[in-house]
Each structure stands twice: as C-alpha cells, then as structure tokens.
C-alpha cells in the first residue's frame, strides 16, 4: 500500500462527501449550542443531540430566509442544508440552504 499525504486523504474524503446526493439536501433536528455570529454577516453554531454534534453555518446570503429570533442556545430546531467538507482542516459542517 502506497502512503498518501494528509492533503490527499482529506481531499479524497471531501470528494466522497460532495458526491453523495443524500448529503446535498438533508433535514437534521437538534439543539443549538455555541451560538455566535459576526454582526451583519454569518451565523455559526453547533447542532447537538444526546450523543453527537455537527458544526452549522448560515451564510449571510441565507439570513433573510430565517427568523433569527428563534436562534438561541438550547433551542430545538430543524435545519435543512447540505454537508460541506473543509479539506484544509479535515472537517465538515452542515450549511443552511
């Protein structure tokens, strides 16, 4: 077996995630944790349940489609989005769509 670099591994995993149609529009229910935003820009939080968490992003261009008053730590929400990898860090997040 030929060794590969970390970059090659992360890019390979990202390619798999991007090509999975089930992850391009997915509905996820969970509780908001770690809510933060950049004034007038993007919203960031973790979506958690009893066992797991996933980072979530709501980009500025999608903020007009949501009621920001309901976004707060501890609130149970449903997020419709896509799973997007960030190969540089070997991470992925749920992005609001």
Spans of model-derived segments:
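OB-fold and OB-like single-stranded nucleic-acid-recognition modules
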Residues: 1-97
